[in-house]
Amino acid sequence: MGNTQSEGNSDDSHDKDKNNNNGDEEEYEKMCNEYDRKTSSTQIYAKEAMKLHEEGKLVIIDTREVYEHEYAAIPNAKVLSPTTLGMTLVSTVGTGMRYQQNIPLEELKKIPEDVTIVCSCTAGLRSGYCAVDLSKRLQRPVLNLHGGIISWFNAGGKVVNPKTNEQVDTVHTYGENWAKYVKGGKGIFKL
């Protein structure tokens, strides 16, 4: 399993982040744990991330495609989408991540050290690889949101239409496979 920010913490509040409906919680958690293991990224759980977000001590890097982000996003998230080639390289040879030019890396280097940087995607795979890569590039810890925006939403985290900043009650799940894990059947996977 990947590293966790909360390892050794006797507060099992992240267990409440085991998200979804229809009895799929264990299945989703197993999948997310496998993503954590694959990427070797350091994890932060939704409740802890939400607390930092409320305190203004968190920057979310949304590593989903722009169309996913534009549908629903964690408030104030910045988009940095990996390319298909970058994802293929990093998942097969362990290096070579490439990004679409959504946000310059120089901008990320300006984030104060007392602010936690967290990558997020749908369920934690893309963002896990990006968190590991960005940790190296930025020479500082970059965490992965365990379970992605699905866990954030299921834990009661606010998601918004980033163009209007109005709260929405659905999450774009990239594909049909992940939609079933969003509480209340609020997963959308259209282009």
Residue ranges, per PLM feature:
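Conserved G/P- and acidic residue-centered "switch" motifs that form tight phosphate/ATP-binding loops
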Residues: G124
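Short, surface-exposed ligand- or partner-binding patches at beta-edge/loop junctions that are enriched
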Residues: S120
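Structural scaffold elements adjacent to functional motifs in cytosolic proteins
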Residues: I60-D62
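Rhodanese-like catalytic fold shared by cysteine-dependent sulfurtransferases
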Residues: G2-K47, E54-E55, V66-T116, S127-L191
